[in-house]
Amino acid sequence: MIGLVGKKVGMTRIFTEDGVSIPVTVIEVEANRVTQVKDLANDGYRAIQVTTGAKKANRVTKPEAGHFAKAGVEAGRGLWEFRLADGEEFTVGQNISVELFADVKKVDVTGTSKGKGFAGTVKRWNFRTQDATHGNSLSHRVPGSIGQNQTPGKVFKGKKMAGQLGNERVTVQSLDVVRVDAERNLLLVKGAVPGATGSDLIVKPAVKA
């Protein structure tokens, strides 16, 4: 089953009939418009390309304008691709709404996490800080040793050190679908999802459901 592209609106909470508070993320899923259908004969795999939202006319490049015009759809804010399963069929220009998730219990949500800039090991990797006193005057938040000796004489790949934190593609799996509001194009999922308010999200049925 394909997924949909939405926009993170923010977090709130809803209450069950028993008065239990559920933290939810609100995702606005406007109609996803099919801009291209890829098939085995021409592309070697089956997939659809979709767009959503709108883009100012002066921000649409000529290649983009031609691509959207050929599909007969309004220029969107980006292009995304979803692989098709056997038996799934879509046509160029078709609109896919949030009702796609009407019978889905759990979803995987992919987004770009908030960028935190250059961060030390305590913030980035949850390293313990060293002693505040007892003779320690300069090394409270330093990572400590990063290697051994002349053998192996190098720092191993993957060593946890200071560096860029966040601003990377992150997927949160198996979030419960709390509500599908087709009238307002909203999808409510339990818990937090990656990214800042207003950022694009890819929502797919959970692979581990």
Swiss-Prot record:
It holds the Pfam family Ribosomal_L3. Gene3D superfamilies: 3.30.160.810, Translation factors (2.40.30.10). Methylated by PrmB. The modification N5-methylglutamine is found at residue 150. One of the primary rRNA binding proteins, it binds directly near the 3'-end of the 23S rRNA, where it nucleates assembly of the 50S subunit. Belongs to the universal ribosomal protein uL3 family. This is Large ribosomal subunit protein uL3. The lineage of its organism: Bacteria, Pseudomonadati, Pseudomonadota, Gammaproteobacteria, Enterobacterales. The gene is rplC.
